């Protein structure tokens, strides 16, 4: 298996809901007029708390400097696992539960914090740039590590870090944060970039302007219903995560879905904002899912984490994670 270190240098930022109008010009340019920018990696996720942005340094320049933009203090690098040769876009993606044992757990064992972004196409593991030597040392035995340089995939330089490593003890990793499962059903989908202009107005409404009456009506009918929408445009590929009510607003022939039309339920992780320094949160969730062979998407945001699991597995997932929670007591 190959681990690709992509060349994007990323910023992770948060915008409060009430301040989004200060940033819509730049965000619309990044999402819908990307040919007018040098940005190659852009993701915007709306949660009930805020908007989380993951964007490369070129794209970050499109956003105004503002006290209303909270930026995590590190530069992040995106890694992804590819089974076999070829570019990351053409090879088979591997679900987050499939990389739980080989990537997520070993990094947690070495106290390396990760930030996850699953998309329709693949799973990106974000690590702080300063942690890269430790990441490579930790994963070198398991993977062929390749680096993308000027668009070419080449063997990664061995950064030769050996100090400070101890063979980790195999520890139990109980789930330590509160879990909740909203009532929404979600789909993970994509669309052809050439069709983006036909739904730009709709997407702009969904992303920035639909916080009005419709949502409050839905909310009153289903108290556990939450606002969650994720749009990613990464290296020319679009990924969308939305609930079924939002999906129904789109022309059905434009969205890609799996042949099974799979629907997903969400597990939200965290009672208080999680921060960026705690290690092992993704591992706490993904390891029990991997043990049960349950596929999952995983989306970290500025304040909370979100796992998406097949609708039919949600009860088993909650039970497995609650068992893990009980083990900490």
Curated annotation (Swiss-Prot):
It is found in: Cytoplasm, Cytosol. Its main location: cytoplasm. GO terms for cellular component: cytosol. InterPro entries: ACT-like_dom_sf, CASTOR1_ACT-like, CASTOR1_N, CASTOR_ACT_dom, CASTOR_fam, CASTOR_mTORC1. Gene3D superfamilies: VC0802-like. One of its GO terms (biological process) is cellular response to L-arginine. Residues 72-139, 262-322 form the ACT domain. The keyword Cytoplasm applies. It comes from the Eukaryota. Keywords: Cytoplasm. Coiled coil: none annotated. Pfam families: ACT_7, CASTOR1_ACT-like, Castor1_N. PANTHER family: CHROMOSOME 1, WHOLE GENOME SHOTGUN SEQUENCE, CYTOSOLIC ARGININE SENSOR FOR MTORC1 SUBUNIT 2. Functions as a negative regulator of the TORC1 signaling pathway. Belongs to the GATS family. May form homodimers and heterodimers. This is Cytosolic arginine sensor for mTORC1 subunit 2. It comes from Xenopus laevis.
């Amino acid at each position: 298996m190959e681990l690709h270190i992509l060349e994007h240098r990323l910023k992770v930022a948060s915008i409060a809901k009430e301040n989004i109008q200060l940033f819509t010009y730049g965000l619309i340019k990044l999402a819908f007029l990307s040919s007018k920018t040098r940005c190659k990696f852009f993701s915007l996720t709306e949660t009930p708390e805020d908007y989380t942005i993951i964007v490369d340094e070129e794209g970050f320049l499109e956003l105004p400097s503002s006290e209303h933009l909270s930026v995590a203090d590190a530069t992040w690098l995106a890694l992804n696992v590819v089974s076999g040769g070829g570019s990351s876009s053409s090879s088979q993606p591997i679900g987050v539960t499939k990389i739980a044992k080989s990537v997520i757990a070993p990094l947690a064992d070495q106290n390396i914090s990760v930030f996850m972004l699953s998309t329709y196409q693949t799973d990106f593991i974000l690590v702080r740039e300063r942690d890269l030597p430790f990441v490579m040392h930790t994963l070198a035995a398991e993977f062929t590590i390749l680096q993308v340089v000027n668009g070419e995939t080449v063997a990664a330089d061995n950064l030769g870090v050996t100090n400070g490593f101890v063979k980790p003890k195999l520890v139990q990793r109980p789930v330590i944060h509160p879990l909740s499962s909203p009532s929404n059903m979600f789909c993970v989908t994509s669309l052809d970039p050439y069709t983006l202009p036909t739904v730009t107005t709709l997407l702009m409404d969904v992303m920035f302007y639909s916080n009005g009456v419709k949502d409050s009506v839905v909310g009153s009918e289903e108290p556990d219903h939450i606002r969650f929408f994720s749009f990613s445009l990464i290296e020319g590929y679009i990924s969308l995560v939305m609930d079924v009510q939002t999906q129904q607003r789109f022309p059905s022939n434009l969205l890609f879905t799996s042949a099974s039309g799979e629907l997903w339920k969400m597990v939200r992780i965290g009672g208080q904002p999680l921060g960026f320094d705690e290690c092992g949160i993704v591992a706490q969730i993904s390891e029990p899912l991997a043990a049960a062979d349950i596929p999952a998407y995983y989306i970290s945001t500025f304040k909370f984490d979100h796992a998406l699991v097949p609708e039919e597995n949600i009860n088993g997932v909650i039970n497995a994670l609650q068992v893990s929670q009980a083990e900490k007591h």
